[in-house]
Amino acid sequence: MSTRLGFVFTLLLLYWFKTMWAYTVDFNLDIQGFYQVFLAVINPIPLSLLFIGLAFYIKRTKLFYLLSFSIYVILFIWLISNSIYYREFTDFVTVNTMLASSKVSAGLGAAALELFRPWDIIYILDFPILAFLFLKKLVKLDPRPFNKRASFAVTSLSAMLFSANLFLAEIDRPELLTRGFSNYYVVRALGLPAFLGYSANQTYMANKERSKASEVDLKPVEEYVASHYAQPNPETFGLAKGRNVIYIHLESFQQFLIDYKLKVDDKEYEVTPFINSLYHSNETFAFANVFNQVKAGKTSDAETMIETGLFGLNQGSFMVNYGGTNTQQAAPFILSKNGYQSSAVFHGNAGSFWNRNTAYKQWGYHYFFDASYFTKQDDTNSFQYGLNDKIMLKDSIKYLEHMQQPFYTKFITVSNHYPYTTSLIGDEIGFPLAETQDETINGYFATANYLDSSIKAFFDYLKASGLYENSIIVLYGDHYGISNSRNPALAPLLDKNSETWSSYDNAMLQRVPYMVVIPGMNKGKVIETYGGEIDMLPTLEHLLGIDSKNFLQVGQDLLSPNHSQIVAFRSSNYFVTPEYTSYSGRTYYTKTGEEITNPDETTKEQLDKIREAANLQLKISDSIQTGDLLRFYTGNDLGKVNPDDYSYNNSMKALKKIEKEKGDASTSLYSQKGNQSTVDLFKAPSYKELHPEQFSSSSSSSDDSSSSSSSSSSSEKK
């Protein structure tokens, strides 16, 4: 290390070691065979040598050491950022993600700290050691500069190594960079610095795509939409026509929670009793095989799909990157053209989170009630992702009752949000924790139980106020709550073996609830049809008697007998059908979970056909989204949203003004009740009030112990 060359190669070795640590401990790169191991071992070297080696061109001693170490620190930050990001998103940081970071960082706070692990000390151990060596002058600065020829030789060597790396990577995975198989393929083959360049190019191409798009690009889109359209089921078309629409967003809620009973100390606890009752009600169309189709945009991806019938982006969040600029024909705007008088979103977090306050205007939402409209947040009523659900729902009533009917609304809950250890406070603590080595999993069931009781309180209000009978209530889970990296720890709770846990099991855990409650209907049932979030909008439209035929949407009505049942995940070549599941580069029989390793020709043809259909659906959606093609579309009479028509300031004043102007013609609940408020009809008892027997005597000591553990965990996380 006492020479310039030695110092650079020391930094190179340290970066290589840390990368190997990340590949082994944090990333799931599905490395198989000697060839892929070899690629993974060599890929950190070429570009790190290229970048750190740039310092060889510097003659001044201190500047050489400062520059080389600074480049090393930048590479380190990129590595550790991806390691932490991967733990939650099971993906890598893209340029779009970084560009959007200011829009999604509000409210993250302590949740980011939850992603750190004890072994992260490995990533930073070298910094104090290097500082000690230089401060004690155990390593001396080398004043001898490299000549230009030697410096260029290092640059050339790194370029040759990268070329060789790329050549070998193409042998392992042909068209690696052109077909965009998966981000982890690129990282596995070329490393994180190369992935950053790949991502930057993808972002540039996306922006370029929009600038060069024209009306001509609409033709294949319109042809696809026409051929993909699924005729509505005549038995369900218009079944809920004219009713208020109430969407309830079930944060991080996975399908396996339905009917699940958590066993603690030989006693079973039903996690979501009320939601279970809705699932099995004859007033509910409940879907057993609907999958989330989100990627890094997570909640924003889910919102994009249910509102627009189009996918989120392969990289980053559509709402953040395009939501405030693209022309869109979303549900609130469509319904406003079909007799709906008002629309609103209720969400107890900052309006800027996921760029909602801008994207919602492009979607045509009349009102957006964010955290500024609700009870002031403090340690007793909220956590880093917003106001707790019961309080948010109660605070929403004073606005909801003034909305003109029929209305279209969405309530975004947050309490069942990662890390599941900080949102429950005081008398809401009591549901037992699971008993695994993962605190995130342990708390997941308690926060889901809290969400369940919040939803019950809201339904009770709807019934007491009279809104229930004239509404259609749609409940949906937005994305997974337990990430794939944690699923093996979850496995025993699902009667599965952690050692044999597979990509098939991960795929099946992408199911999320989708329930359509139509009060007064007796045709409800549990439906086994396979579908995804992309299908929710056309399903709702047809239930409301609005034909989706002339809308540029790529989903299909889940109640249609013509529904294709091909579910495309956002990652290319990931899909699920009733017959086959393709996930993380492996293919399985969906019914049995048996891996297909040597498919016959018939099976190959079927898989190729499904893969082509899934990828085409994503391609068509992406062309609409990245090309902003709806700005050219004239295939319906909706027209275009003017975002300047909407303001989310002083919304209560605006609601009351409309009531006053309409007078006796006002259709708001407040007007219908003779200008009497219904706020007091909302009752949301705490867990302690709902389960007094659990706290009333010493005979319940085991349950009290669980509660105490939960309280302690919550305090520690705060």
Map each language-model feature to its residues:
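A diffuse structural propensity rather than consistent per-protein peaks
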Residues: 83-95, 114-117, 208-217, 299, ...
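Transmembrane and membrane-interface helices of multi-pass
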Residues: 1-199, 689
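Conserved acidic functional residues
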Residues: 41-42, 190-205, 252, 470, ...
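Membrane-interface segments at or immediately adjacent to transmembrane helices
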Residues: 165-240
